[in-house]
């Protein structure tokens, strides 16, 4: 059985980590966890500052026990589950997002909904906004300290090593919610 965790992962944060670890617990030793990255081919912009391949690398650096697949966005919600299934295959969706759960249930999928405490602290737009404020800070210990409550250390190191935070400072507008 495949347990599927779906998200944009812009970037992988501790809310995602909690969800993926829950899926790993459910999968045990016999089943597989597939992390499906949505909006994988979107143009780089404030809401999607990292490419699908960059996000895949972040996830694989954090945990190499999961399979990571990329899903191009088709902007067609009624047909999206069938489109996504071509990338992640059949299985059980593990999610904390009510809309995603409903979309998959409408397509006759088994869905396990996981409650996240402090969900508001693990919203991608908040994390991207914080990262943008740190994008020109050269004190990497300070960057690590501020981001450590939201991001796994491996993702923070990836962002620093790849100079991937600086990109956020180049956007003319703020990062978008959602």
What residue ranges belong to the model's regions?
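Nucleotidyltransferase catalytic core that binds NTPs
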Residues: 1-178
């Amino acid at each position: 059985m495949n347990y599927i965790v779906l998200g944009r992962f812009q970037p992988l944060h501790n809310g995602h980590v909690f969800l993926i670890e829950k899926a790993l617990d459910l999968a045990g030793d016999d089943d597989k966890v597939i992390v499906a990255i949505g909006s994988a081919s979107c143009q780089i912009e404030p809401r999607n500052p990292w490419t699908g391949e960059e996000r895949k690398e972040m996830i694989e650096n954090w945990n190499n026990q999961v399979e990571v697949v990329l899903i191009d966005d088709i902007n067609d919600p009624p047909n999206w589950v069938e489109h996504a299934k071509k990338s992640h295959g059949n299985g059980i969706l593990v999610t904390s997002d009510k809309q995603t759960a409903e979309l998959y249930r409408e397509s006759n999928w088994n869905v396990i909904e996981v409650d996240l405490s402090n969900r508001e602290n693990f919203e991608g737009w908040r994390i991207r906004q914080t990262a943008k404020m740190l994008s020109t800070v050269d004190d990497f210990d300070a960057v690590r300290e501020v981001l450590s409550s939201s991001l796994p250390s491996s993702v923070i190191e990836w962002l620093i090593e790849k100079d991937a935070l600086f990109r956020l400072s180049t956007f003319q507008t703020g990062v978008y919610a959602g």
